[in-house]
């Protein structure tokens, strides 16, 4: 019987079919620890689920993971629901997860803690960014559900405390999937209006699921970016939402938020009354002091004898004018003297005087130079004449004029001894007026006696 060989693809598909048709593997509840977690740019999640003895590859596509509130991380223990299948390309089986919950802690609670830590690290909770609530807001915006006790409590409290204030309500959804985008849009709209002084954002109490819109990241960032100060009023005395941490001020209830946003008109009236009384008292004291000062002035010499005071002041003015005239004349005399001194100095140090002095000095130096040049020239001429006379006395031509001559050999070398020639050598004799060509016909040596 001939053997039938399967391809790897055929075998893998067979195994995949077997697994996918097994009802026990199409709805699997599994718990384990996440490792090798990767969040793909398209939104899919890839990771490994493991326990002490085994591991399995896991995939959670974007269509399913967008519903989870927390952020999966390595080391996190989770409870998952999914189905088992085979990834043909690698031949490995894996679980395709449809739902995932944290193991041991609630899904929403974990998501809350993760977002709280992340936003706090970014600085969204810092007091540095908190805006002051205006003490006398003219227009108060309220972002909440248009129905329910919260909006009634807020409006009733504001109108009771501050009836002259304006209230603008921005109706929104406060729970459900559409609640967070609705709240974000209302915050943006209030900021764009440009007339809201303070915003109250909140709702009545409820469970964590009902309050979850106020734990959404988009709501937290919208509150942080708001130019209008925001008071959060979610309605839980003890529990805090993410919105409470980001808001500029947190109120435990909607009624408390209204009291923080709107001043008490009775207290304002009391303040106005107290300040009016203080102002009146201060004005009375000021008028009293001015009256006393006026009485003192009325009793003064100037008020009682104004003509004498006028004459005294007129006399003082005349003296002051005389002193001013004298001072002016002294000042002018002083400046005239200074001008004369400057003129004398300039005349003394005028450039023409300096030029004349320099010209005389140059002429004197020129005459001195001429005398010294003449003396030097005469000295040089005298030295030259003496040197010429000395040279003339030593000149061979001078000796020749006395009958002497110079004898040269054929190579034009001066002969100094009879030993320098031989019989028959040609020699030349230079006299003062010419040269004789001769031939040696005889040689007679003589002894020198003291050079003679």
From Swiss-Prot:
One of the GO BP terms on file: DNA catabolic process
Compartmental location: Cytoplasm
GO MF, any single term: exodeoxyribonuclease VII activity
Gene Ontology cellular component terms for the protein in this record: cytoplasm; exodeoxyribonuclease VII complex
Enzyme class: hydrolase
Reaction equation(s) it catalyzes: Exonucleolytic cleavage in either 5'- to 3'- or 3'- to 5'-direction to yield nucleoside 5'-phosphates
Signal peptide positions (record): none
Keyword terms: Cytoplasm, Exonuclease, Hydrolase, Nuclease
EC number(s) from the headed UniProt entry: 3.1.11.6
Pfam families, per database record: Exonuc_VII_L, tRNA_anti_2
Family (UniProt): Belongs to the XseA family.
Function: Bidirectionally degrades single-stranded DNA into large acid-insoluble oligonucleotides, which are then degraded further into small acid-soluble oligonucleotides.
NCBIfam families assigned: xseA
PANTHER family recorded: EXODEOXYRIBONUCLEASE 7 LARGE SUBUNIT
Subunit note: Heterooligomer composed of large and small subunits.
Protein name stated in the entry: Exodeoxyribonuclease 7 large subunit
Gene name in the database record: xseA
């Amino acid at each position: 019987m001939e053997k039938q060989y399967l391809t790897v693809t055929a075998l893998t598909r067979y195994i995949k079919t077997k697994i996918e048709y097994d009802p026990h593997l199409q709805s699997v509840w599994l718990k384990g620890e996440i490792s090798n977690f990767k969040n793909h740019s398209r939104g899919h999640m890839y990771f490994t689920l493991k326990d002490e003895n085994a591991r399995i590859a896991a995939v959670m596509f974007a269509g399913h993971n967008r519903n989870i509130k927390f952020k999966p991380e390595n080391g996190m223990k989770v409870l998952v629901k999914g189905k088992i299948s085979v990834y043909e390309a690698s031949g490995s089986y894996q679980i395709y997860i449809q739902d995932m919950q944290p193991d041991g802690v609630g899904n929403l609670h974990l998501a809350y803690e993760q977002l709280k830590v992340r936003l706090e690290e970014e600085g969204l909770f810092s007091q540095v960014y908190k805006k002051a609530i205006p003490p006398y807001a003219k227009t108060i915006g309220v972002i909440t559900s248009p129905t329910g006790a919260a909006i009634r409590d807020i409006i009733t409290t504001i109108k009771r405390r501050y009836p002259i204030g304006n209230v603008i309500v921005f109706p929104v959804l406060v729970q459900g999937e559409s609640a967070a985008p609705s709240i974000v849009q209302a915050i943006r709209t209030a900021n764009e209006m440009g007339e809201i002084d303070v915003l109250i954002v909140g709702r009545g109490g409820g469970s964590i699921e009902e309050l979850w819109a106020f734990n959404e990241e988009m709501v937290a960032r919208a509150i942080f970016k708001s130019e209008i100060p925001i008071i959060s009023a979610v309605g839980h005395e003890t529990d805090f939402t993410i919105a409470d941490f980001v808001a500029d001020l947190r109120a435990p209830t909607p009624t408390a938020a209204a009291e923080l946003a709107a001043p008490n008109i009775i207290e304002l009236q009391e303040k106005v009354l107290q300040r009016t009384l203080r102002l009146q008292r201060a004005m009375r004291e000021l008028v009293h002091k001015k009256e006393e000062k006026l009485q003192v002035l009325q009793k003064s010499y100037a008020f009682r004898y104004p003509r004498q005071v006028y004459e005294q002041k007129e006399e003082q003015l005349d003296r002051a004018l005389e002193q001013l005239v004298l001072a002016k004349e002294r000042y002018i005399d002083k400046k005239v003297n200074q001008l004369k001194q400057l003129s004398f100095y300039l005349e003394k140090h005028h450039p023409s005087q300096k030029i004349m002095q320099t010209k005389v000095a140059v002429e004197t130096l020129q005459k001195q130079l001429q005398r010294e040049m003449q003396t030097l020239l005469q000295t040089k001429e005298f030295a030259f004449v003496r040197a010429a006379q000395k040279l003339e006395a030593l000149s061979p031509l001078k000796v020749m004029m006395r009958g002497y001559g110079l004898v040269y050999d054929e190579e034009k070398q001066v002969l100094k001894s009879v030993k320098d020639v031989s019989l028959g050598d040609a020699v030349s004799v230079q006299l003062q007026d010419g040269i004789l060509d001769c031939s040696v016909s005889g040689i007679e040596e003589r002894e020198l006696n003291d050079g003679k």
